[in-house]
From Swiss-Prot:
InterPro entries: Cyt_P450, Cyt_P450_CS, Cyt_P450_E_grp-I, Cyt_P450_sf, Cytochrome_P450_Monoox. The lineage of its organism: Eukaryota, Metazoa, Ecdysozoa, Arthropoda, Hexapoda. This is Probable cytochrome P450 4ac2. Its EC number is 1.14.-.-. It comes from Drosophila melanogaster (Fruit fly). CDD domains: CYP4 (cd20628). GO terms for cellular component: endoplasmic reticulum membrane.
Length: 511
């Protein structure tokens, strides 16, 4: 009997190894997921760079215990090693397809099937629910349709007045900081949050006692999201509950959600009593807010209370952080490039200074300033990565993607591709003059994403940014303090730097 087992053992081992090898061609067994294959049967490495891993379990342990700084560097290093090719990682339960080329990004972003966001966005669900950023299929289509009127030209004109008022308040604050180092990270986010709060909810955040707590809660929620982003094990809710800042997230979500929910209830009461647009208790006519569009949709049965909360929280989150990030980097680049700042001043100095005498059309004519904003977004996209998920097996870019494949589109790399932008690290606003964009790939510059899931509020954001830049440049010269070499970039929901970005303001003569 012993001899039979002894002689049979090699055969069993041989069969097991053959079976393992056969299965492992289709499945990455130790990573518990199906492999990506080529549609034409060619070697996978001929189509895509397969990134090496630290262990036999795929790339799962490559990201453990990273900081927001080190994970950003890891992503950039991985792209550098791929040498301009798209590349592949394998995580537990799912492969991740990383896209760094505009050509392949186009197919993804233009697809009518690949509209579901990837697992990273699941981390936002406790805050944003099923809002426009995260929702998919019919819910997304109906919500997008319902919200589109909130960004109509006439609505933007009414928002322009709010932007101007907040700019005037900010300029008064900035006058107190003249000839001193100014930390942009301390003043700009407050400006954008005030803007988005009044345009989304119809209330002035500075007038509310809860305003400070709300700002603090948003910041705390982002800190927890940052923690989860830096460790894939925290994506698991049980692991996060046991070892992460779960209670911190819950407590601050309660503050943020109660704030927006209370405002919604007050606005709903006015809506039902047909008092919107009438004078409030201070004798001021109440302005339109994005929330009014949602309340009208609720009255028509298109959305419920939770849906309204989700959309308001989504707009507050997206409109606050991304815009402030763009403004901070643009002001930094203006400080570092005096010639560009001078051209912007020449373009805006004849704009009417009175909000009653200015229109969206006049800001649309600030062509050079828009080129400056675009170049800033190209170098420093507010959202450096966007994601999709395959909800079913299908062919993408000539590759057979298994169900649940995660797709990561690296906007940071795509918009620094030397094939589309010569001297890609240089700040050159002229590259966005119409004559210089003729032969450029249409998906080489996509800071607001593209296709049907592009950012619904991009015109809102560009207008808000122009209004603030015009106000600052009209009143002050911006001088550099922080240099690009001083900065350490961090990866999060939005692009951040470890250091606060500082400039120095001096009054303009003969303003």
């Amino acid at each position: 009997m012993f001899l039979e087992v002894l002689f049979a053992a090699p055969l069993v081992i041989f069969i097991f190894r053959k079976l393992w090898a056969h299965l492992n061609r289709t499945y990455f067994i130790l990573s518990l997921c199906k492999r990506i294959r080529t549609e034409d049967g060619s070697l996978l490495e001929s189509k895509i760079y397969v990134a090496p891993s630290k262990t036999r379990f795929g790339n799962n342990f490559d990201l453990v215990n990273f900081t927001s700084e080190s994970i950003f560097n890891f992503m950039r290093d991985a792209s550098a090693k791929a040498k301009g090719r798209n590349y592949l990682w394998y995580f537990f339960h799912a492969p991740m397809y990383n896209i760094v080329r505009a050509e392949e990004a186009e197919e993804i972003l233009q697809s009518s099937k690949l509209i579901t966001k990837n697992m990273i966005y699941e981390l936002l669900k406790p805050f944003l629910g099923e809002g426009l950023l995260i929702s998919t299929d019919q819910k997304w289509h109906s919500r997008r349709k319902a919200l589109t009127p909130a960004f109509h030209f006439k609505v933007l004109q009414s928002f322009l007045i709010i932007f101007k008022e907040e700019c005037n308040k900010l300029v008064k604050v900035l006058h107190q900081s003249v000839n001193m180092e100014l930390e942009l990270n301390q003043v700009i986010p407050q400006f954008t949050l005030n803007n988005v709060c009044e345009t989304a909810l119809g209330v002035k955040l500075d007038d509310l006692s809860e305003g400070i707590r709300y700002r603090q809660s948003i910041h705390a929620i982002e800190e927890v999201m940052q923690q989860r982003l830096c460790n894939p094990f925290f994506y698991n809710i049980v692991y996060f509950f046991l070892f992460g800042d779960y209670r911190k997230q819950v407590n601050n979500l309660k503050i943020a959600h109660e704030f927006s929910s209370n405002i919604i209830e007050k606005r709903r009461s006015l809506f039902k009593s047909n008092q919107l647009g009438q004078e409030d208790e201070f004798g001021k006519k109440q302005r339109y807010a994005m929330l009014d569009t949602l309340l009208a949709a609720e009255a028509d049965g298109q959305i419920d209370h939770q849906g309204i909360c989700d959309e308001v929280n989504t707009f507050m989150f997206e409109g606050y952080d991304t815009t402030s990030t763009c403004l901070i980097f643009t002001l930094l680049m203006l400080a570092l490039h005096e010639d560009v700042q001078k051209k912007c001043y020449e373009e805006i100095k004849y704009l009417p200074d009175d909000s009653d005498d200015i229109s969206v059309f006049q800001f649309n004519e600030l062509v050079y300033m828009e080129c400056v904003i675009k170049e800033s977004l190209r170098l420093f996209p507010s959202v450096p990565f966007i994601g999709r998920r395959c909800v079913e097996e299908g062919v993408v870019n000539g590759l057979i993607m298994p169900k649940n494949t995660q797709i990561n589109i690296h906007l940071y790399e795509i918009m620094r591709d030397a094939r589309h932008f010569s001297n890609p690290k240089m700040f050159q606003p002229d590259r966005f003059f119409p004559e210089n964009t003729v032969n450029r790939h249409p998906f080489a510059f996509v800071p607001f994403s593209a296709g049907q899931r592009n950012c619904i509020g991009q015109k809102f954001a560009i207008l808000e940014i122009k209004v603030l830049l015009a106000a600052v440049i009209r009143n002050f010269k911006i001088l550099p303090v922080t240099l690009l070499d001083d900065l350490t970039f961090e990866n999060g929901i939005v692009l951040r730097t470890k250091q606060n970005i500082k400039v120095k303001l001096v009054h303009r003569e003969n303003k």
